C-alpha cells in the first residue's frame, strides 16, 4: 500500500475544499483546482464564517491576519488576541479539527502601525497505517500547521497596507513503508494586502465604506518526495467591500461582499485531450514544472469567470455588544460546487467577546453541512483598564 498517497487522499477529503460531487455533474462541468496544504484556505474564525466566509473589508478584529492584515492599522483597540476552534467534517469523522490563535499590537506614533502574528494547526485525526495484507503497522497523527508574522501601516488617514510572512509545515506522520520518502514537507509564503476606508455622510448619518484586497500564500511549492511531484500552495486573491450605516441609536448594519480567485492553474485532464495520452503527458509535465509565479499569471486564462467564488453577508450590531450575522457562499459547479449559508451571533462584554457560527450547505450530502465554529477574543486595552494600568 502506498501509505502517503492514502494519507494525501485523506488530507484532500478532510479539508473539503471541493464539494461532495453530485452524480449529475459531468466531468466536463467539474474541474476544481487542486493544491497542497489546502487547510490554509479554511476559514478559522466564527465571525467571518457566519457571513459566508468573508472579511477583506469588514472592520478590523483580532482575526484580520487571515482576511486582510492591513486592517490592523485601523483597529480601534491597541491590542487584541483571539482563539478559534473548528470541528471539521463532523458528519464523517470526529477527530479532525482546526485551531487558530491570532493577535496584534499597535505601535508607532498615533498607533498608525501594527505587528501581528498567528498560529494555525489543522489535525487530520488518527490514521492507521496498514500493509498490503491489512496488518496494522502503526497509528499516526498527520497534521498541517502555519506560523505567520505580519506588519501593517497607515499610508494616509484612509489607506493602509500590510505584509505577512508565513512558514508552513505539513507532516503526514511516521514513514513506515519507504525509507526513501519523507513524511513531511515545508514551504514559505507571503501575503500582500491593502485596506481603504472612508466615512461618508448620508442624510444626517455618518456611514463607513471600506475596500480591501489580500493576495495570500504566494510562495514555494510543497513536495513529499524530494521535489519529484511538487504541489502548488493555495495562493488566492481576495477582493472585498463593506458598507456600514446606522439604523438608529446604538444600532448598526454592515453589508459586505467578497470575491475570491485561486491563483493556481488547473491540472490538465486526459478528457481535455480527446484521449491523446502523449499530449496529456506533455501538458502535465509543463504544469508540474511551472513556477508558482508563472502559475499565478496562467490561472487568469483558465475559465476565469467560473473560478471566482462570491460571499455576501450582513452583520447587525447593537451597541457593539450584541451581534447577529448571516451570509451566503457561492462557488460554481465547475470550480467545486460549494454553496452554503452561514449564520451566527456574538456577544461582547468589557474585555471578552464570544462568537459562534453554523453552516448550512445547500448541496445534498455535503460534508461541510452543520459545521460549527467558536471564537473567543480578548481586548487587551480593556484588560489593562480593568487592572487600572495605562
Predicted regions and their residues:
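Bacterial N-terminal signal peptides that target proteins for export
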Residues: 1-8
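Surface-exposed charge patches in extracellular/virion surface proteins
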Residues: 4, 20-21
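Acidic, glycine-enriched active-site microenvironments
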Residues: 13
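Subset of outer-membrane beta-barrel
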Residues: 22-390
